[in-house]
């Protein structure tokens, strides 16, 4: 259900939005292009789907606990995949023309490497047939990956050995999160927890090899925290503590890596996304300079290009990225500021910045109250912002550098920690091979 009246009051009270944030428009005038909005509230064991054009809740997956760290993989034609931590299991979900989500397959994830805590990272292949679910077992160099063939309804789980690294945060030896990739030809499972990249034969794992040996290995930087892969699955990499490293895939293993330092002193990028061009990674990170500003950093998968743009100080959402701009919301003192960063001529998101103060909707102050989640339609015409504890999602239309608040969508739960959002369009071409 859409609630435009709350926004009208909020915009009137602000009185400072001329030229940047237009007043709400009636629903009949809006022309949203994102068909469905997936809204998850793990604390409430709730996953629902809303019609982005009307705000109507069209269906739900009762009892599902969407793993927000691993996120959602877009598989195309209205199909998504995510880990339901209530299982745990990998759910492949189809959202059809009615907006009702249907579980196409549900694959249990056995615990073979130790007590299951959560899925760390999930990924699919460029053909969007296979999915890999990696574990996140703290303090252990023995992890596991479940590989699922969604076409054959076949799944196998393998134990994977990772390495200890010198932790950038403490200087001591320890373990990091394991990242997963499904890339290359023939198809390989590539994993890293820092220190090295290991490549495994997917056909051998699906054939029953539960303790596979790597078919190729190459050195890799420490402290990876954000897997990135181009849409064709030919180059992979990660955001590290001090910069970004990418490695091309060869038939026999790996090519020469390319490393580039962050342009501004910062903590490692937080969950970068792949841009629609399939070759540019974009994420938000916290700077270490005066005021610890939020930085929006973008980098090329194929060259040395990297750029950072300061957005202001405060708690930041994950970035979203569209063909024409990247965006994030920074919250400070209870005020949400949306920043749109235009895509530059070289393909990086380092162009003009448009910042917009968003209207308040009665969110309360207190621990966790600054939690937000931002999602964008594939073409960038719409943004959706959740706010912790409000039980609603703000809708924003974007045209050029003008953002127009359209209304809010009331959702079935409070979104106590900000929840999780993803847009799903049956005509959307997937360009990101990792869960986001």
Residue positions per predicted region:
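Secretory targeting and sorting signals
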Residues: 1-30
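An edge-strand/N-cap motif at the start of beta-rich repeat modules
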Residues: 29-59, 78
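Short beta-strand elements that form the blades of beta-propeller/WD-repeat-like
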Residues: 33-41, 78-85, 127-138, 180, ...
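Short glycine/acidic-enriched loop and turn motifs that connect beta-strands
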Residues: 44-46, 86-89, 136-141, 196-197, ...
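A short beta-strand motif characteristic of beta-propeller blades
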Residues: 56-63, 99-112, 154-171, 206-218, ...
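Repeated scaffold domains used in trafficking and secretory/extracellular systems
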Residues: 65-78, 111-126, 162-184, 217-231, ...
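Short loop/turn segments immediately following beta-strands, especially the blade-tip
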Residues: 93-100, 147-156, 200-209, 247-254, ...
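Solenoidal tandem-repeat scaffolds enriched in leucines and small polar residues
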Residues: 138-269, 273-275, 295
């Amino acid at each position: 259900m859409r609630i435009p009246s709350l926004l009208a009051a909020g915009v009137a009270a602000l009185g400072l939005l001329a030229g940047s944030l237009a007043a709400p428009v009636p629903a009949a005038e809006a022309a949203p292009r994102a068909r469905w909005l997936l809204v998850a509230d793990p604390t409430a064991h709730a996953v629902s789907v809303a019609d982005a054009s009307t705000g109507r809740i069209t269906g739900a997956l009762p009892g599902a606990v969407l793993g927000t760290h691993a996120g959602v993989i877009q598989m195309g034609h209205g199909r998504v995949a995510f880990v339901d931590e209530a299982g745990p299991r990998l759910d492949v979900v189809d959202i059809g023309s009615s907006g009702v989500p249907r579980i196409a397959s549900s694959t249990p994830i056995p615990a073979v490497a130790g007590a299951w805590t959560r899925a760390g990272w999930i990924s699919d292949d460029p053909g969007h047939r296979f999915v890999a679910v990696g574990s996140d077992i703290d303090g252990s160099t023995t992890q596991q990956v479940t590989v699922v063939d969604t076409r054959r309804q076949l799944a196998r789980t393998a134990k994977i050995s990772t390495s200890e690294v010198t932790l950038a945060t403490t200087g001591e030896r320890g373990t990091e999160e394991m990242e997963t990739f499904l890339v290359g030809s023939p198809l390989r499972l590539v994993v890293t927890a820092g220190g090295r990249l290991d490549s495994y034969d997917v056909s051998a794992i699906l054939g029953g090899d539960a303790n596979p040996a790597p078919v190729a290995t190459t050195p890799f930087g420490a402290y990876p925290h954000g897997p990135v892969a181009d849409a064709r699955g030919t180059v992979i990499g990660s955001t590290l503590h001090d910069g970004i490293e990418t490695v091309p895939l060869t038939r026999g293993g790996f090519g020469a890596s390319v490393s580039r330092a962050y342009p501004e002193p910062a903590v490692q990028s937080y969950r970068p996304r792949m841009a629609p061009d399939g070759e540019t990674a974009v994420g938000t990170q916290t700077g270490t300079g005066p005021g610890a500003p939020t930085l929006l950093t973008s980098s090329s998968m194929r060259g040395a290009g990297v750029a950072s743009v300061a957005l202001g100080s405060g708690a930041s959402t994950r970035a979203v990225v569209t063909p024409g701009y990247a965006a994030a919301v920074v919250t400070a003192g209870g005020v949400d500021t949306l920043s749109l960063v235009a895509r530059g001529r070289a393909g990086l998101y380092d162009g003009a910045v448009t910042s917009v103060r968003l209207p308040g909707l009665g969110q309360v102050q207190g621990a966790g109250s600054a939690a937000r989640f931002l999602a964008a339609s594939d073409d960038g015409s719409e943004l959706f912002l959740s706010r912790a504890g409000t039980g609603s999602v703000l809708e924003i239309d974007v045209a050029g550098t003008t953002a127009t608040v359209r209304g809010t969508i009331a959702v079935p739960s409070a979104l106590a920690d900000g929840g999780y959002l993803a847009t799903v369009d049956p005509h959307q071409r997937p360009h990101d091979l990792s869960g986001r």
